[in-house]
Amino acid sequence: MERFVVTAPPARNRSKTALYVTPLDRVTEFGGELHEDGGKLFCTSCNVVLNHVRKSAISDHLKSKTHTKRKAEFEEQNVRKKQRPLTASLQCNSPAQTEKASVIQDFVKMCLEANIPLEKADHPAVRAFLSRHVKNGGSIPKSDQLRRAYLPDGYENENQLLSSQDC
């Protein structure tokens, strides 16, 4: 009799797994949150291996509190570790840098008005006096740099001042 018993066909065991999905497919799907290494899917900020077959496992991980916490820490670390570009570092004008520039310009202007050659700034006695008695006086460069960098500025400033007085 067993031969004549009709049994129902086996139910299809359809799971919710994608059969032909690779970790690289999930990386392109979820963007910069994930990365693939050695055929495994990793969360970039948590550095945890994720199941690349189940999309729900990935989305649940990305919504979890631990992921959001670690992501914030990861981004904070990246901000601290990033190097500043050289141009940004050079353009940074702190109050000390602006004061230094104004002291040097005033020194060049004083030398020009008193007919003191800029080479006199290289004399050891002048250097000692400036460093002892003038605030930021030790930061005044040698005469060749004064001539190259600061003399043209003083010349332009004086020309503008004279042209504004002539009007």
From Swiss-Prot:
Note: Binding is severely inhibited by complete or partial cytosine-specific DNA methylation of the binding motif.
Record-level GO BP terms: epigenetic regulation of gene expression; negative regulation of transcription by RNA polymerase II
Transmembrane segments: none
Protein name: CGG triplet repeat-binding protein 1
Keywords: DNA-binding, Nucleus, Phosphoprotein, Transcription, Transcription regulation
Organism superkingdom: Eukaryota
GO terms of molecular function: DNA-binding transcription factor binding; double-stranded DNA binding; identical protein binding
Compartments it resides in: Nucleus
Cited function: Binds to nonmethylated 5'-d(CGG)(n)-3' trinucleotide repeats in the FMR1 promoter. May play a role in regulating FMR1 promoter.
Region annotated Disordered, chain positions: 65-86
Coiled coil segments of this chain: none
Record's GO cellular component terms: cytosol; nucleoplasm; nucleus
Span(s) of short sequence motif Nuclear localization signal: 80-84
Phosphoserine PTM sites in chain numbering: S56, S164
Tagged with keyword Nucleus: yes
